[in-house]
Amino acid sequence: PEALGHERIHQLEATAVANAEQALSTDGPEEQRFFLVGYTPTQFWLDHYPLTTLLGHTGQHLEAAVVATFLPSEVVDSLYAVMQKAGLEVASMTLEPIAALNAAIPADLRLLNLALVDIGAGTSDIAVCRDGSVVGYTMATVAGDEITEALMRACLVDFPTAEAMKLELGRSKSVSFTDILGLEQTLPAEELFSLLDGPIQALADEIAQRICQVNGGPPSAVFLAGGGSKLP
């Protein structure tokens, strides 16, 4: 028999994705449309034996498992509309944690049980890999904005000022700002960090909980990306 090539493997993956799409359309509301925005093969089987890749192998019975992500059509349409207004065309689309993990964690390191967390402004996107494959994605709805809002309340400043203070915290021993009363103040970075202990701990706890949920327990290591990851 002929050895398995890229085309046959892609066909197998496409079948798995099509099955996922069929299951989603069957279980979801009839009026809701979803679009595939990314998928990652998590495991292959050749004649019922698990493999990380089928390329170059021969066998009779092939199976593939994938993690496929679908977004509501309204979200995808909005993204395309923004690109069109900017005079650009969409060549491909993927999820932030997929892109971040592919960029930050080499394929040979994905044999380890690792998690990558991209802490942005509004959400913290999480991807988990083990045994050579990406095995799951999830998202925590807490991120850098929670820290900014905590600074607003603690120091009586507006959002842009709090955002600038947050950025300065990682670079300086003291932070100067003007509060909403027009008073100029300078506080030691350590004092500001003490004010943020609660929100930072809550952010860390939520992310840790999400990682353990999608991974089934603590991973061997966690990689951090995004601006929010610069917080201590």
Features from the language model and the residues they span:
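Gly/Thr-rich phosphate-binding beta-strand-loop-beta motif of the actin/hexokinase/Hsp70
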Residues: 106-136, 151
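Nucleotide/phosphate-binding catalytic cleft detector across ATP-hydrolyzing
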Residues: 1-114, 144, 171-194, 214-221
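Conserved ATP-utilizing enzyme core subdomain
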Residues: 142, 149-179
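Short glycine-rich, Thr/Ser-proximal phosphate-binding strand/loop in the N-terminal lobe
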Residues: 1-3, 133-151, 155
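Glycine-rich beta-strand-to-loop/alpha-helix junction loops that act as flexible
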Residues: 220-229
